[in-house]
Amino acid sequence: CDQNDVEGAEMDVFRPEYNGTGQNGNFYPECYIIPLDGKNQTNLQAAADMMEWLTRNDVKVNVTEKEFTYDGVTYPAGTMIVSMYQAKRSVANGALYDGTLINGWTILYSEGITSFNETRGFDMVTVAEPAAYKSISAVCGDAMDHDDVLAYTNSLGSYFTGEKNKDVVISNASEDSTAAVNELLKAGKTVGMVTSGDHMGDFICSYADYQTVAGKYLLSAAGVDKTSVKAKIITKSPTVYISGTPAESEKGFVYTPQISQSAGWNYDTAAMNLMGFTTTSDVTKADAAAGATKLDAAAKTAVKNGLPYIGYSYSAASSASDLIAGVEYTELDGAMDCLTPVVYPNKTLVNASYIADGDDILYAYGLGYFSKVPASATVLVKSDKTKTPTEGFIPTNTAERAA
């Protein structure tokens, strides 16, 4: 249906079919391949988390018992397969398919985010050829439910390649990699960040120290000779100030403002905890600041005096001009969100790992952007104007919006 509930309208937008050579001609593919090996999977943690998410929602998954080849790539035994031949295929497909880009509607109640592989950062391949699926399904084990998957993911370990008993480069690709580094730093271990070369933006530590975290986290790592790697020592695990800490309630349950009225603060707190950072509501005790809420006066002063700061969301971005002269922030009228291809104009330690992993898709919620920045600013990421977003709600139904 379209915005006016006309049955069958815009079917090509909302239910496109796989009509390529040898493909099934359906909206649903045959299956999805989600690698669980370090050679074919950039983010092992996110892939394992997705396996648990799917089965927690009653989707059945399979794991291959032998290697197989699809589209010229060989996948080992232990690769996850999400079949579309099951009762809950719409649950799985709704999370994994590449989404719908809506331009012609005037308004949308809420974002319709899909493409979990892009938003969560794991590698995935869509299979739409029945012949290929027949070969893949032939090497699959029995369907797994949530209990089966929990046992399976608990048995997964970090991926290591290269020389043992030297130094180890840990790929900076997930919450787990950051949490592992924070654990090492808090234990007084030496960890560096690689400053140049193929591993720029990744972490480096000793093999012995790597082994203390490799069993706890799902990491991708490579043994290297440290003389071939340039790195800067990370002096400590930073304490992070989270903006927008809500005051306690004077009546009733004191934490009501934190639990039910402060979504941004809650998300930021959860994210920092997942990555192993110590957090504080006192900016004078912080080594860095981050958050989705506009900075208060004390935090703003600290940032102006040099405190590193990561701000996102409308609240933070629209107030950037309070911190940096010459910044202008613009929002697209009526737009909701999109998954958009991006480019990286400048390679720095902030974005080097994204560049190395070929991660050129960014999820933008609210569709605000910096329409003007100072000439001296280093731009880390920009939307790629030569490509079309794959998913989202960007209305172009009026001349003003289309412009």
What label would you give each PLM region?
Residues 1-403:
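Intrinsic-disorder/low-complexity accessory segments
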